[in-house]
UniProtKB/Swiss-Prot annotation:
PANTHER family the record matches: RNA-BINDING PROTEIN HFQ
Keyword terms: RNA-binding, Stress response
Subunit structure: Homohexamer.
NCBIfam families: Hfq, PRK00395.1
One biological process term in Gene Ontology: regulation of translation, ncRNA-mediated
Family: Belongs to the Hfq family.
Pfam families in UniProt: Hfq (PF17209)
GO molecular function terms attached to this record: RNA binding
Coiled-coil portions: none
Source species taxonomy: Bacteria, Pseudomonadati, Pseudomonadota, Betaproteobacteria, Nitrosomonadales
Protein name (Swiss-Prot/TrEMBL): RNA-binding protein Hfq
Keyword RNA-binding: yes
Record HAMAP family: Hfq
Length: 84
C-alpha cells in the first residue's frame, strides 16, 4: 500500500483505538467480528473483546464504527477523489 492509503487508514484506525469506539469488522469471507481496536500496524489489527484477536488486514473487507467519526485530513493533502 502506498502513502495515500496510509493518509486515511492510520488516522481512521487511530481515532477508533484512542476513543475506544466499538467496531464491527467484516472479513472477505463474510465473517463479522466485533470489539475494540487495541492496536494495529502495517499488516494486522488487534481486536479486543473477551479475548484479543489478531486480524490480518488483507482479510478485512470493511470496518464499521458503532458511531460516526470525523477524520482530520490536512488541507494540503489531496485524496484520490480530488484527482481528475
Amino acid at each position: 500500500m502506498g502513502v495515500k492509503g496510509q493518509l486515511l487508514q492510520d488516522p481512521f484506525l487511530n481515532i477508533l483505538r484512542k476513543e475506544r469506539i466499538p467496531v464491527s469488522i467484516y472479513l472477505v469471507n463474510g465473517i463479522k467480528l466485533q470489539g475494540q481496536i487495541d492496536s494495529f500496524d502495517q499488516y494486522v489489527v488487534l481486536l479486543k473483546n473477551s479475548v484479543t484477536q489478531m486480524v490480518y488486514k488483507h482479510a478485512i473487507s470493511t470496518i464499521v464504527p458503532a458511531k460516526a467519526i470525523s477524520i482530520p485530513i490536512p488541507a494540503d493533502t489531496q485524496t484520490e477523489q480530488d484527482e481528475p
